[in-house]
């Protein structure tokens, strides 16, 4: 099982490391995330380096989730996968049963790119709509720190929440 990490900053200050385990029974989805953590695929169709490094969590909703992974636009409207722009929902084996799950953000069926979210509570209403592909194994305290960040009315953090460094362990 692959393990990836995010070294996070909030408002430019180090906030700690989040370590995530990727599930083997969603191999295509997990591989997309892993490769975007390492940045090994180089420049993507958008002309941007295909990596989460330097990207932000653009949406934080307490008692729900933290969303990030838009490395092309940074506002939730962009992102791309290692397979091209978008890819299909792989399966819905895993359910949104606990905090700390890693799941794909999308704009409807078959629209997975690079955006993901980390749950901060169980979110069963997302089952069958979003592909769960991993879980936080260390650094839930960092997730809680991000969750507590003040946001504007559009759920955008007032202090920049950035993935300063990321990769595979």
UniProtKB/Swiss-Prot annotation:
Reactions catalysed according to its record: [protein]-peptidylproline (omega=180) = [protein]-peptidylproline (omega=0)
Residues of the PPIase cyclophilin-type domain: 5-168
GO molecular function: cyclosporin A binding; peptidyl-prolyl cis-trans isomerase activity
Keyword Coiled coil: no
EC number: 5.2.1.8
Pfam families in UniProt: Pro_isomerase (PF00160)
Keyword Secreted: no
Alphabetically ordered keywords of this record: Cytoplasm, Isomerase, Rotamase
Activity modulation: Binds cyclosporin A (CsA). CsA mediates some of its effects via an inhibitory action on PPIase.
InterPro entries tied to this protein: Cyclophilin-like_dom_sf, Cyclophilin-type_PPIase, Cyclophilin-type_PPIase_CS, Cyclophilin-type_PPIase_dom
Residue pairs linked by disulfide bridges in the UniProt entry: none
GO biological process, one term: protein folding
GO cellular component: cytoplasm
Compartments (UniProt record): Cytoplasm
Function: PPIases accelerate the folding of proteins. It catalyzes the cis-trans isomerization of proline imidic peptide bonds in oligopeptides.
Homology family: Belongs to the cyclophilin-type PPIase family.
PANTHER family linked to this entry: PEPTIDYL-PROLYL CIS-TRANS ISOMERASE (PTHR11071), PEPTIDYL-PROLYL CIS-TRANS ISOMERASE D-RELATED (PTHR11071:SF561)
Name of this protein: Peptidyl-prolyl cis-trans isomerase
């Amino acid at each position: 099982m692959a393990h990836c990490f995010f070294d996070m900053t909030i408002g430019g200050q180090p906030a700690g490391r989040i370590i995530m385990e990727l599930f083997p029974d969603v191999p295509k989805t997990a591989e997309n995330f892993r490769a975007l953590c390492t940045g090994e695929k180089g420049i993507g169709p958008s002309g941007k380096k295909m990596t989460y490094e330097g990207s932000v969590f653009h949406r934080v909703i307490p008692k729900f989730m933290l969303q990030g992974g838009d490395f092309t636009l940074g506002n939730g409207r962009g992102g791309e996968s290692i397979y091209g722009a978008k890819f299909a929902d792989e399966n819905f084996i895993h359910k949104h049963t606990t905090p700390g799950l890693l799941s794909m953000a999308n704009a409807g069926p078959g629209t997975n790119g690079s955006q993901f979210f980390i749950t901060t509570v169980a979110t069963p209403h997302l089952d069958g709509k979003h592909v769960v592909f991993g879980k936080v194994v260390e650094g839930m305290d960092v997730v809680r720190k991000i969750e507590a960040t003040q946001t504007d009315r559009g759920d955008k953090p007032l202090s920049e929440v950035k993935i300063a460094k990321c990769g595979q362990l």
